[in-house]
Amino acid sequence: MRILSIQSSVAYGHVGNSAAVFPLQRIGVDVMPVHTVCFSNHTGYGAWRGPLIAGTDITEIITGIEERGGLTGVDAVLSGYQGGDSIGDAILDAVARVRHHSPEAIYACDPVLGNAKSGCHVAPEVQNLIRDRVVPAADLITPNQFELGFITGTNPQTLEE
């Protein structure tokens, strides 16, 4: 199995690619990590340091992978934290490119917005992009309760909701 994983990278803690890549590799998955940010820690701490990777840079990395034939045989694209709205566009472009080379590939989106305890961790334009464009393009989404409420415009309190 081959996965293109477009997510955050943090030095302190385990979220995004910092949490996903090693376990997937340990079970034999070929993971191509592309980072959306390179932060000291996740933004839920309220303060962090490090760069947001521009959408154009993410697209350049995907282009380099594509030029080497790396998008052929991809089984899934995973996406997570999107610190800027250009990142969402780059992810959607990457999904389209992967599907051009690997039509059966699925797109799994973790619509990282925040959580009930600490609220929203992303800018309003990112919230809208995720809800209006990224989630509809996904085959699978993995929202937490807070994110599900935002995406659906509801306030789910139980599993049934």
Regions found by a protein language model. Name each.
Residues 1, 24, 145-149:
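Intrinsic structural disorder
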Residues 2-109, 113-117:
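Conserved N-terminal subdomain of the carbohydrate kinase-like
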Residues 120-161:
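Conserved phosphate/ATP/ADP-binding segment of small-molecule kinases
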